[in-house]
Amino acid sequence: MAKAKFERTKPHVNIGTIGHVDHGKTSLTAAITTVLAKTGGAKATAYDQIDAAPEEKERGITISTAHVEYETKNRHYAHVDCPGHADYIKNMITGAAQMDGAILVVSAADGPMLQTREHILLAKQVGVPAMVVFLNKVDVVDDPALLELVEMEVRDLLLQYGFPAYEVPIIKGSALQALAGKPEGEKAINELMDAVDNYIPHPVRATDKPFLMPIEDVFSISGRGTVVTGRVESGIIKVGEEVEIVGLKETQKTTCTGVEMFRKLLDEGQAGDNVGILLRGTKREEVERGQVLAKPGSIKPHDQFEAEVYVLSKEEGGRHTPFTNDYRPQFYFRTTDVTGTIKLPADKQMVMPGDNATTFTVELIKPIAMQQGSKFSIREGGKTVGAGVVTKINN
């Protein structure tokens, strides 16, 4: 029988498994593909294929991530699973794998553990909009009262981190039973996918967000004016629309008088396009790489913020020594480096290479266009020593 082709007609959603080590994230990922393969919605992917995840580089950081894809009757999913705890932290902080929703896997035998908490916190900070819980390994728990207790603990934890704990679906099952083809195991996987289909909202497409383009290059065309080039990050820009140039200096307003792509004139540029935008009345020296072109009022420049950061270990090419308060590296946002000073929390004397999920405050020497959820790298002497996400703007 010919293999059914994935239809791209269904809405696409990016999802990932999160949770404590050994609670069954990878087994669950394998179980989902195995159960959905029976109805032609996936290619069954074995545990060891997912566990041997290839390494990828994202903003100078090596991350192991496994990608599988599958579909339900309503949606097409791209699913990420990371073998190691540090890979999760790096993945979520760098945004290497953007998640529209997550499946939190908790072992019914152990209940929520340290990494369960860390992953929920990170999901909140990087803006994962919704999650569904899979209470795994229920086949090894005989006492229904214990299951209830674990469920209550999970809801308490979700509540602490600002998720709507009493709305979040919690599905009980066993990934191993599903992999073994047992009916109760498969039933739980189908229930889980129904919950994911119905509870995790449709993602807002990049083209529906306000227009934003990081400026990569600026040049002047004699007789026509100044052109800025870059890849449109979100939204749509049409000829004749007003835009703002934000970051590094005073924000200025200007008008887009032309959009070009591959030397052809367009009426508009949209998310994902590499374009040149002609700006009315703007001088070449008034714009520079590192600023952004944006819909007026949609993004502001800031120079003080709080961040959640992953600091590379020595083995990953990071620093060999810890850093302390007032450390001054470069912060790389989108297309440019800006020097900034790090202020550590009062209870922290230093940050060691390899520390994951570290929180501190940053003060930049120049303001950069940013918002909560903006990603950055920390660089020193041209090499990446960390990656972070803005969790709160302070000014």
From Swiss-Prot:
PROSITE patterns: G_TR_1 (PS00301), G_TR_2 (PS51722). The lineage of its organism: Bacteria, Pseudomonadati, Pseudomonadota, Alphaproteobacteria, Rickettsiales. Mg(2+) binds at T26. Its EC number is 3.6.5.3. It is an enzyme of class 3 (hydrolase). Its main location: cytoplasm. This is Elongation factor Tu. Residues 60-64 are annotated as: G2. It is found in: Cytoplasm. Residues 19-26 are annotated as: G1. Residues 81-84 are annotated as: G3. Residues 10-204 form the tr-type G domain. Residues 174-176 are annotated as: G5. Residues 136-139 are annotated as: G4. PANTHER family: ELONGATION FACTOR TU, MITOCHONDRIAL, ELONGATION FACTOR TU-RELATED. GTP hydrolase that promotes the GTP-dependent binding of aminoacyl-tRNA to the A-site of ribosomes during protein biosynthesis. Keywords: Cytoplasm, Elongation factor, GTP-binding, Hydrolase, Magnesium, Metal-binding, Nucleotide-binding, Protein biosynthesis. InterPro entries: EF-Tu_GTP-bd, EF-Tu_GTPase, EFTu-like_2, EFTU_2, G_TR_CS, P-loop_NTPase, Small_GTP-bd, T_Tr_GTP-bd_dom. The gene is tuf. It comes from Rickettsia akari (strain Hartford). Pfam families: GTP_EFTU (PF00009), GTP_EFTU_D2 (PF03144), GTP_EFTU_D3 (PF03143). GTP binds at residues 19-26, 81-85, 136-139. Monomer. Belongs to the TRAFAC class translation factor GTPase superfamily. Classic translation factor GTPase family. EF-Tu/EF-1A subfamily. GO terms for cellular component: cytoplasm.
